[in-house]
Amino acid sequence: MAKQVIQQAKEKMDKAVQAFTRELASIRAGRANAGLLEKVTVDYYGVPTPINQLASISVPEARLLVIQPYDKSAIKEMEKAILASDLGLTPSNDGSVIRLVIPPLTEERRRELAKLVKKYSEDAKVAVRNIRRDANDELKKLEKNGEITEDELRSYTDEVQKLTDDHIAKIDAITKEKEKEVMEV
């Protein structure tokens, strides 16, 4: 039972790190990346649909995204959705594809993005710590019910703490990498 609690905690922590990585993909770091458009939803015949389900997105150059809609009639709606998103990008279309030129970031914008990276990082760490707390509470219940001994409880909480430390170290490494990418000129 205690091993199960630890396994569940590990899986939840892994998911928290994955969610954090996905959040960071949406932060524009001055170079093109299909993940930038992940959160853009298009009003497609009255249904909010993610843009990556309506078009193929490619990165032919470092600062250019090309969006090729499967349905050409949706181009105008896609343009509206991109303009409405807070990406700060201006689409240009030639009737069959939408091109997004990614301008170089200003120093001020870089600092804002670095702050945002730190905020996401802190949120992810809080999520991991909450998972640790929940796992430790579960283990304490098991000890209280007599399913594990006090020594086993200590051993298992140490294991949960090690998991927490590992995941927080992962988050720190990812954060450092993304901050470096954002601050790069």
UniProtKB/Swiss-Prot annotation:
Keyword Cytoplasm among UniProt keywords: yes
Keyword Cytoplasm listed: yes
GO BP, one annotated term: translational termination
Superkingdom of origin: Bacteria
InterPro entries reported in the protein's UniProt record: Ribosome_recyc_fac (IPR002661), Ribosome_recyc_fac_dom (IPR023584), RRF_sf (IPR036191)
GO CC terms: cytoplasm
Regions annotated as coiled coil: none
Alphabetical list of Pfam families matching this protein: RRF
One GO MF term attached to the UniProt entry: ribosomal large subunit binding
Subcellular location: Cytoplasm
Keywords associated with the record: Cytoplasm, Protein biosynthesis
PANTHER family named in the record: MITOCHONDRIAL RIBOSOME RECYCLING FACTOR PSEUDO 1 (PTHR20982:SF3), RIBOSOME RECYCLING FACTOR (PTHR20982)
Function according to Swiss-Prot or TrEMBL: Responsible for the release of ribosomes from messenger RNA at the termination of protein biosynthesis. May increase the efficiency of translation by recycling ribosomes from one round of translation to another.
Family of this protein: Belongs to the RRF family.
Descriptive protein name: Ribosome-recycling factor
Organism (species): Geobacillus kaustophilus (strain HTA426)
Organism lineage: Bacteria, Bacillati, Bacillota, Bacilli, Bacillales
